[in-house]
UniProtKB/Swiss-Prot annotation:
InterPro entries: GATase_2_dom, GFAT, GFAT_N, GlmS/AgaS_SIS, GlmS/FrlB_SIS, Ntn_hydrolases_N, SIS_dom, SIS_dom_sf
Positions of the catalytic residues: C2 (nucleophile), K603 (for fru-6p isomerization activity)
Highest taxon in the source lineage: Bacteria
Protein source organism: Buchnera aphidicola subsp. Schizaphis graminum (strain Sg)
Pfam families linked to this entry: GATase_6, SIS
Protein's name in the database: Glutamine--fructose-6-phosphate aminotransferase [isomerizing]
Length: 608
């Protein structure tokens, strides 16, 4: 969602600020702005609605120079999309950019209005700026002291960076539920909501932890924890290559990321599968501590990660013989919970910053779970920091809003984990060896399916003008149908629904006619014959069917079969999503949609 970039240096930082927020465009935004302190110690602010390129043109006309500044991309939560609501927000000598939501902003706004403050925007961010100014005027304290005290009055999950025209040598950063990272330079330092914004200038980072306040200057950084005690945070060296965030030969990031899946899966397997055994060095003794005694698994996630969790439920129960419940994170947090005995709490998230999932994790800590594990793509993320242990997917940077390689690498990690647990609990002989061997071949099998792209392009041309599409799947293919429908909705804006094939007669069959195509995934498994019956039911009612299968299926009228290379049943969910990703991509491409930044959506949803 919103993006923050800030810098304090000994050189002009205007170009850096603009380049930084441009790198954060993938997170989703509707407006952007920046503020700097000029040579007269005044704050200069420039804002606009629309793309960062529009802001760039406005800034270039001003010919600004400054050693300190902050910039922001806004995704509207409080107040409509307008220049007046665009960050940064100013109160006298104080400028603020902010991610997240201040839940008690209305109460604070009324308080400040009574004190004589005039609001020019509808945002909760302007409330922060005026509150800091009021507190400093009242007490005469330094801005750092004011921020440390004032943050206790701000309810909600947020992060902010504050700039003071009366002290132009430093920036102040606060993390309270929303991520911030400090980039370390030589006689210069940087702040961002995502390391991607900083990768072209540094590989050295410090991730602020919950409740931290940081004073960032050119030559030093002081960090205070939630108790306002000075503390040293660990420095991390990123191994992410800057060139990996370029599209290269591909038209869109989503296309690039679909075709990166063989290498992303291979990276996820590397150093974890050796001589037909699976090893997670990250877990250490927690592997036995959590899972040997586990009698239940509770997984929470959102969006694509939720669909990966849904697939894993079938694996947990059929392989490890452990009951598994999967719930959407926002729903988990919204009800009174009855926790099973000896249950392990697992979260899935690409970014590790999904607000709903973080909220669920924080609630779980009070409920008596054996422990918490997160499966995540970002090592320094909040979920990684706040969980008892973590497993990284190693998918690499994913920029397209519609997740692709994070889904298949999540499933890869989950299947390895379940194989380890199955062996640990002595449920099935040789299951670890079998799955290790199958997964070792997975990257090449993904490559084989990607070679079907010409067929899928043709299919996309047939479907691109449809208003509604129905996806069906049985067993562990039902979550794949859900993910296929989600991908199509996200980037093509075609209405798509997914149902278990067995539910067809319980309502969805009423929708079947020649205008609603039905897409079915039908790998060889024990449910294939039942799926064939569903196909006949649809054809008998004049439906149009497209079947992805590795088996020969008798052709019916108005039926198209897209042949998929044979795959082992256990990894069919990982492989059958690939053609559905391609299908969604090529349909959106033919419709001319903004594939990497679909309307109203953000890559990392950091507000509840």
């Amino acid at each position: 969602m919103c993006g923050i970039v800030a810098a304090v240096t000994q050189r002009n930082i205007i170009d850096f600020l603009l380049e930084g927020i441009k790198k954060l465009e993938y997170r989703g935004y509707d407006s952007s702005g920046l503020a700097i302190i000029n040579k007269n110690q005044n704050i200069v602010r420039i804002r606009c609605v629309g793309r960062v390129n529009k802001l760039l043109k406005k800034v270039k006309k001003k010919k600004l120079f400054s050693n300190i500044g902050l910039a922001h991309t806004r995704w509207a939560t409080h107040g409509q999309v307008s220049e007046k609501n665009t960050h940064p927000h100013i109160s006298s000598h104080i400028a603020v950019v902010h991610n997240g939501v201040i839940e008690n902003n209305t109460k604070l706004r009324h308080f400040l209005e009574k004190k004589g403050y005039i609001f020019y925007s509808d945002t909760d961010t302007e409330v922060i700026a005026h509150l800091l100014h009021w507190e400093q005027t009242k007490t005469g304290e330094s801005l750092v002291e004011v921020i440390q005290r004032s943050k206790m009055k701000l309810n909600g999950n947020y992060s902010m960076v504050v700039m003071d025209a009366y002290n132009s040598s430093r920036l102040i950063a606060v993390r309270s539920g929303s991520p911030l990272v400090i980039g370390l330079g030589i006689k210069e330092n940087f702040i961002a909501s995502d390391q991607i914004a900083l990768l072209n200038i540094t590989k050295r980072f410090i991730y602020l932890e919950e409740g931290d306040t940081a004073i960032v200057e050119t030559k030093k950084i002081n960090i205070f924890n939630k108790n306002n005690l000075i503390i040293k945070r660990k420095e991390i060296t990123s191994n992410v290559k800057y060139k990996s965030i370029n599209k290269g030969k591909y038209k869109h990031y989503m296309e690039k990321e679909i075709y990166e899946q063989p290498i992303s899966i291979q990276n996820t397997l590397n150093n974890r599968i050796k001589k037909d055994t699976i090893n997670f060095s990250e877990l250490g003794d927690r592997e036995k501590k959590f899972f040997l005694n586990a009698e239940h698994i509770q997984i929470v996630a959102c969006g694509t990660s939720y669909h990966a969790a849904m697939v894993s439920r079938y694996w947990f129960e059929s392989l490890a013989n452990i009951p598994c419940d999967v719930e959407i994170a926002s729903e988990f947090s919204s009800r009174k919970l009855a926790v099973r005995k000896k249950s392990v709490f697992i979260t899935l998230s690409q970014s590790g910053e999904t607000a709903d999932t973080l909220a669920a994790l924080r609630i779980s800590k009070k409920l008596g779970y054996l422990g918490s594990l997160t499966i995540c793509n970002m090592k320094g993320s909040s979920l990684v920091q706040e969980s008892d242990c973590y497993l990284l997917t190693k998918a690499g940077i994913e920029i397209g809003v519609a997740s692709t390689k994070s889904f298949t690498t999540q499933l890869t990690v989950l299947l390895m984990l379940i194989a380890k647990i199955t062996k640990l609990k002595k449920q099935k002989n040789n299951i670890e060896k079998k799955i290790a061997q199958i997964l070792s071949l997975l990257p090449s099998k993904v490559e084989a399916i990607l070679k079907k792209n010409t067929l899928i392009k043709t299919l996309a041309n047939q479907l691109c003008n449809k208003k509604n599409i129905l996806f069906l799947g049985r067993g562990d293919q039902y979550p794949i149908a859900m993910e296929g429908a989600l991908k199509l909705k996200e980037i093509s804006y075609i209405h798509a629904e997914a149902y278990p094939s067995g539910e067809l007669k319980h309502g969805p069959l009423a929708l079947i006619d020649k205008n609603i195509p039905v897409i079915i995934t039908a790998p060889k498994n024990s449910l294939l014959e039942k799926t064939k019956k569903n196909i006949k039911e649809i054809c008998a009612r004049g439906g149009i069917i497209y079947v992805f299968s590795d088996q020969e299926i008798d052709l019916e009228k108005n039926m198209t079969i897209i042949k998929i290379p044979y795959v082992e049943e256990i990894i069919a969910p990982i492989l059958y999503i690939i053609p559905l990703q391609l299908l969604a991509y090529y349909i959106a491409l033919s419709k001319g949609k903004n594939i990497d930044q679909p309307r109203h959506l953000a890559k990392s949803v950091t507000v509840e």
